[in-house]
């Protein structure tokens, strides 16, 4: 028990008693902001958000990130094989590309079901179930004999792999506060996006030397290893089941390692802080109601526009590079390294910048409200904290670079191969950086349903992205690369004012929603 108490104290937020009188301007800060004189009392009464140490949280983030690799990996590893699939099954390149579109559609739809289920039944059961679906799909793909089977099992593959992103985000939402969430979401995105870098390289190697079917056997083996790590090491984190880590886990919610080591930090008689929700068809579709919230819709829609443009760049790479530069499957796979490294570095860097920006916004908030320097602030303790401002400080320079590089990408195909690869790096860096900001903000807006919120995010991205991938080839045929990517840059530029709208009016919309939900919960 003593070790548990020590761990709890180390994680407990320490908020000092203010020794200064709040400024007159504090009078207009609203009822959502706690009085400074009550901060110490609040912190002494509240248990830590989660008892896991920083290193333990990092370990769990790595496990769920490696699991989430399989959603982008299963899509991107397939890109260099498109030409071989077309020839092997005697179909056109457009039909081969359609298998990517189908994958992305299901990739968008499936997490809405799995995410809400994991918010109700737990993260581990859904993780395990979806991975079993994924492994079965890969075995079937490796043995598929015709185009119909390939399409059907690609859809099943997407249904199994896509949920790993929303469930992984749910795990992060369960164990983190807003002030530490940015860097962990960045790590989650960076490790996950490793699939963007290594996927096409592996796909090119397998296709060149072993045939495209070997891709699916590789995914079966790698997916099995990831499933094993979840079974052995990942505990249940859903707060209505596991609480803040002090509730004893049993059955499927208990990782195999606890059978050997025991579960540390358990408090006798500890109960979850929230009630477990029931799974129903209503709960499955409930996350779609998030889209009627103005701040959520704007955040998701703009992120989806960027995702669509990025998807159109990557999905057209195989055909463009093969036609313009005459590259083989292996060489095309290697050209995706720029895109992959851009994804990883963008997610890592922007994730850590978000934590820095959170601290910067904390200081500004404390100065405005008369709190002492060093006061830790998050949405749970201070609901009026401007999380939108904290998350979106990096957005402006990131989107500016994204628009410029997309506009130049089509023209770059007339130059040396290195130029479009470098531009792909910056396009991927900026797009993934924006996804990281987008993902963290969505979790902040719905912290109690982070998996469902992430699933809706994934739904909008993938449906718009699938539409973009489906039409990119006809647009390229009609406008040629120069004007195609200039058009995409222009569309992004036109949508950019949405960022100002979210920054300016988002906090007010969030406060109104919180008051409405609180009144509904109280039966008013």
Curated annotation (Swiss-Prot):
Glycosylation: residue positions: 90, 244
Pfam families named in the record: MFS_1
Reported consequences of knocking out the gene: Decreases concentration of citric acid and increases concentration of oxalic acid in growth medium.
Residue ranges of the region described as Disordered: 1-49
Ranges of Polar residues composition bias in the record: 34-45
Reaction(s) this enzyme catalyzes, per UniProt: citrate(in) = citrate(out)
Membrane topology term: Multi-pass membrane protein
Entry's Gene Ontology cellular component terms: plasma membrane
Main location: membrane
InterPro entries hit by this protein: MFS, MFS_dom, MFS_trans_sf
UniProt keyword list: Cell membrane, Glycoprotein, Membrane, Transmembrane, Transmembrane helix, Transport
GO MF term set: citrate transmembrane transporter activity
Domain of life from the UniProt record: Eukaryota
Residues that span the membrane, as ranges: 60-80, 95-115, 125-145, 155-175, 186-206, 215-235, 296-316, 332-352, 395-415, 417-437, 459-479, 481-501
GO biological processes: citrate transport; export across plasma membrane
Compartments in which it is found: Cell membrane
Function: Transmembrane transporter that exports citrate across the cell membrane.
Homology family: Belongs to the major facilitator superfamily.
Name of protein: Citrate exporter 1
Origin species: Aspergillus niger (strain ATCC 1015 / CBS 113.46 / FGSC A1144 / LSHB Ac4 / NCTC 3858a / NRRL 328 / USDA 3528.7)
Protein's gene: cex1
């Amino acid at each position: 028990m003593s070790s548990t108490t020590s761990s709890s104290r180390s994680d407990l937020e320490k908020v000092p008693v203010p020794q200064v009188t709040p400024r007159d301007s504090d009078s207009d800060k609203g009822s959502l902001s706690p009085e400074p004189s009550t901060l110490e009392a609040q912190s002494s009464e509240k248990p830590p958000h989660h008892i896991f140490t920083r290193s333990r949280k990092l370990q769990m983030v790595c496990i769920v990130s490696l699991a989430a690799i399989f959603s982008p990996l299963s899509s991107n590893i397939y890109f260099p094989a498109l030409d071989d699939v077309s020839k092997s099954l005697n179909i056109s390149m457009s039909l081969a590309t359609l298998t990517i579109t189908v994958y992305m559609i299901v990739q968008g739809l499936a997490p809405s079901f799995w995410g809400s289920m994991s918010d109700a039944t737990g993260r581990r059961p859904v993780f395990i179930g979806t991975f079993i679906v994924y492994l079965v799909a890969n075995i079937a793909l490796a043995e598929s004999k015709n185009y119909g089977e390939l399409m059907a099992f690609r859809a099943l593959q997407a249904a199994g792999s896509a949920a790993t992103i929303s469930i992984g985000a749910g795990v992060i939402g369960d164990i983190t506060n807003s002030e530490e969430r940015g860097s962990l979401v960045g790590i989650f995105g960076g490790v996950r996006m490793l699939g963007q870098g290594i996927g096409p390289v592996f796909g090119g190697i397998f296709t060149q030397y072993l045939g495209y079917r070997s891709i699916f056997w590789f995914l079966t083996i790698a997916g099995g290893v990831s499933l094993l790590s979840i079974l052995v090491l990942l505990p249940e984190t859903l707060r209505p089941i596991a609480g803040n880590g002090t509730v004893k886990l049993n059955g499927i919610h208990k990782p195999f390692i606890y059978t050997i080591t025991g579960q540390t930090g358990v408090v006798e008689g500890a109960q979850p802080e929230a009630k477990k929700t029931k799974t129903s068809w209503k709960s499955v579709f409930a996350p779609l109601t998030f889209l009627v919230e103005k701040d959520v819709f704007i955040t998701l829609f703009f992120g989806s526009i960027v995702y669509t443009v990025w998807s159109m760049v990557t999905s057209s790479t195989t055909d463009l590079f093969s036609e313009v530069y005459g590259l083989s499957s292996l060489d095309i796979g290697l050209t995706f390294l720029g895109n992959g490294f851009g994804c990883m570095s963008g997610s890592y860097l922007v994730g850590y910048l978000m934590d820095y920006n959170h601290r910067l916004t904390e200081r500004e908030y404390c100065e405005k409200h008369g709190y002492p320097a060093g006061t830790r602030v998050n949405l749970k303790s201070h609901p009026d904290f401007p999380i939108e401002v904290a998350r979106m400080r990096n957005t402006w320079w990131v989107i500016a670079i994204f628009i410029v590089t997309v506009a130049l990408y089509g023209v770059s195909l007339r130059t040396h191969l290195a130029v479009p690869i470098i531009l792909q790096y910056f396009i991927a860096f900026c797009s993934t950086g924006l996804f990281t900001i987008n993902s963290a903000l969505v979790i902040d807006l719905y912290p109690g349903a982070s998996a469902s919120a992430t699933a809706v995010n994934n739904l909008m991205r993938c449906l718009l992205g699938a539409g973009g991938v489906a039409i990119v080839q006809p647009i390229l045929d009609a406008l040629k690369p120069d004007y195609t990517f200039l058009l995409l840059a222009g569309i992004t530029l036109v949508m950019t004012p949405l960022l100002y709208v979210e920054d300016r009016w988002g906090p007010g919309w969030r406060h109104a929603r919180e008051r409405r939900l609180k009144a509904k919960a109280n039966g008013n």
